[in-house]
Amino acid sequence: MRILNYTIINLVMSKHLLLNINKTQKGIIHIIGIGGIGMSAIAEILHNSNYKVQGSDAQSNNNVDRLQKLGIEVYIGHNANNISQAQIVVHSSAIESDNVELVTARNNNKTILHRSDILAELLRDKYVIAVSGSSGKTTTTAMIASIFDHSNIDATVIVGGILNSYQSNSRLGKSDIFLIEADESDGTMLKIPANITVITSINDDHMDHYGTFDDIKHAFSQFINKADFAILPDSVGINYDASNSMMFGFESGNIRASNIKQHANSIEFDVLIDNNHRIKNVVLSNTIGMHKVSNALAAISVAIKLGISDAEIKKGLLEFQGVARRFSLIADIKGVKLIEDYAHHPNEIYATLTAARSITKGKVIGIIEPLRFARIRNFFDEFIRIFMMFDYVILTPVHPPEDKPIPGCGIDDIQKALISNGFNNTKIMNDALLISHFISDSTSPSDIVLFIGAGSNIAKLAKETAALIAEVKV
C-alpha cells in the first residue's frame, strides 16, 4: 500500500497498551457507567488487551450484556463496595461528582481517570486518526473502518456506535494504527494525540460546556491544528493550516462529489480529486441521505491521504454495512417502514426527515424522544419549526429520566407550541401498544415511521412497537 507523506509501514506491531500505567495489568480497572456507548468500547479494548476490567452501571443494556458475555464483571447499581479491589477508577463527564463510587475512590486515594485520560493513554505512541464533529462522526468513523477492513490496514477501532459489521463499538487490531471517534461534547477531542484529525461538521450544540458558538469553533480549530494533518468540510468556517489540510464538499474543496444518485438503499456518486482525478461510480451501501455522502467524502479523504487505492476505497464503501440506530430499518410491514435514528439536534432531525422524504411520497411520522431539557431550551424554536415538517409527531418523555426539568421545556410545552402554530397532528405517548395501534390505524403502504432519539427508551419502544404492529398487520 502506497503511503502519502506518512510512513505507516515502519510502525511496530504492538502487544501492549497503556504504556504509562502498565503496572496495573495485574490489578483492576473499574469503569463507572460501563454500559455507555463510549465507555463500553474502552472496556472491551482493555479487556481484549489482557487488562482486568470491571464496571458498574445504573441499569443493564445491550452493551452491558455484550461485555458480560466477554467475561467482564458488571455491577448493576452504584455501590462503594464495587470498587474495593480496583486500583484505577474511570469515569466520564456524565457521572456526577457525588457518585458514591467516585466519592469512595477519592476518599481512598485511588487513581481516578476521566474517560479522555484513559483514552489518551490508550493512544500514546500510536498512529492515530481521530474523527470528531457535531454530527456524522460515528458514521464517518464506521466508513473509514470499512475501507480499512477492505485494504491492508489492521487498525484498532473505537467508535460511538455499534458497527453492524463488528456487532460492537470496538475492534482490537494488530498494528499501532488507531481509528477513533473523538467526542466533542466535553472537550475530549482536545486530549487526543492525533496524527490525522477529521471534522465532519460544526454546529451550535453543547453550549452548556462551551458557552458560545465562537468557543465551539475555537475548540475545533485547536483540534485540527495540533495534528500533523487535518481533513475538514469546505464550509466549516474555522482557522486552519491550508498547507497541512484537505477539504471535502459538494461545491469546492479537494475532494468533491458529483452525479449523486439516491437508490433504494444505497447512494451512487463520482468523486473528483484535486480537479484532475476521478473515482467513478462509487456505491455507498446501506445509506440514505445527502448527509451520508458528506460522511463518505470525509472517509475517502482519509483513505486518499493514506494512499489507499481507488479499488479498495470503492470496495470498502460498497461493503459498508452501516451503524445501528443510524437510519436503521427495524421493520417493513406491508410497505410501512419503521426506521430508527439517533438524531437529537435539530439539524440532525432535519437531515433524517429529509432522507426519509427522499425515498417516499407517503407520509413521514416522527416518534421523537427529546434529549435533555437544556437542549430543548437552547433550540426550542428550531425544534418546533422542524417538527412541523413531519406529517405527524408523537412525543415521548425527555431522556434521560433523571434529567432535571426546566420550566417551559417539557414535551407538553413542545406540543402546546406546535398546536399554537397551527400544527395539530401531535400526541404525547410512551406506550408501545398505544403507538402500535395509532400507526396501524394511521399508515398506508409507502409511509415511513421514524423513531428518533439518542436514549435507550426510544430504542426499546421502537422494537416493542414493531413487534406489536407485525401482530396487528398480519
From Swiss-Prot:
InterPro entries: Mur-like_cat_sf, Mur_ligase_C, Mur_ligase_C_dom_sf, Mur_ligase_cen, Mur_ligase_N, MurCDEF_pg_biosynth, UDP-N-AcMur_Ala_ligase_MurC. Its EC number is 6.3.2.8. The lineage of its organism: Bacteria, Pseudomonadati, Pseudomonadota, Alphaproteobacteria, Rickettsiales. Disulfide bonds: none annotated. PANTHER family: UDP-N-ACETYLMURAMATE--L-ALANINE LIGASE, UDP-N-ACETYLMURAMATE--L-ALANINE LIGASE-RELATED. One of its GO terms (biological process) is regulation of cell shape. This is UDP-N-acetylmuramate--L-alanine ligase. Belongs to the MurCDEF family. ATP binds at G133, S134, S135, G136, K137, T138, T139.
